[in-house]
Amino acid sequence: MFDFSIITSWVHGLLTSWMPEGLAIFLECVIVGVCLLLMYAVIAIVMIFMERKVCAAFQCRLGPMRVGPWGTVQVFCDVLKMLTKEIITIRHSDRLLYNLAPYIVILASVLAFACLPVARGLEILDFNVGVFFLMAASSIGVVGILLAGWSSNNKYSLIGAMRSGAQMISYELSIGLSILTIVVLTDTMQFSEIVERQADGWFLFKGHIPALIAFVIYLIAGNAEVNRGPFDLPEAESELTAGYHTEYSGMHFGLFYVAEFVNLFIISGVAATIFLGGWMPLHIPGWEGFNTAMDYIPGFVWFFAKAFFVVWLLMWIKWTFPRLRIDQILTLEWKYLVPIGLVNLLLMVIVVVFKLHF
């Protein structure tokens, strides 16, 4: 499988031959940052279009069809329209926190997005405590949401923000336990190493029952973490209008909207990385010809295919199940998912100690 570190090393050598090393490193950081933001924007556009089409399919509709072939240009038109909208600042609001909140949410999303290993040698932030960094970066978004609700001077926004904060903080525990289950299996917290350990089989299939249970818990908790249906109580239209979004307009609302969709992709990308092998191709023992053919498919194609499969799965869940009440959401987490996650972690420890995994 192709290693993108060959390209990055060549670019680094080329830049250092033309300029001082410090300036070359600075230029590399700028290039990587621009590429990260471009990929972030492209993923957001693809996710929004996919959401509208999947929603339409489940509701026996066609979705966007007018602008461009099969409605592919509709999202770009919506972005242009949003860019022209006036950003209205609410009277008696805390203007500093009100304007700062969307950018905190975006910052948390971008930092978490940078942790995803897209292909071998194509990781932006890859170090030995990558799991810790991902959990820490993703938790910053809760601060932005609470600030948005508090600074809007609106009781519905505040209630929506408090619901969202309680929900996100609670379900981070189950996400952490699910990821920790795989960390115990691999003995590493570096995402690239977790992927490399799956060269002979994805953990969803070779980690036995604890890995499967962790995957199911992760999908449920991840859906709740990004406030997607049936866990989208912070935006319950019949109760709170738009929740903490209520008083936001223009690009401020757009930043919240984009962050929600990219966070969904991040949850799916992490699931693809730790459970489905990341950039590793599908290999079947004994099928040498098939395995060789699969190796020719680039790693980033495998990663995005797996990630978007999980995205589709989560969208299917959203448009299938009815919205839960806040007490049902917290009961599901504290009475069921957390205890099951703890017992499952203990089972994985037993599996690893007695070498019961493949």
Regions inferred by a protein language model and the residue ranges of each:
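Selective transmembrane helix interface/packing segments
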Residues: 1-358
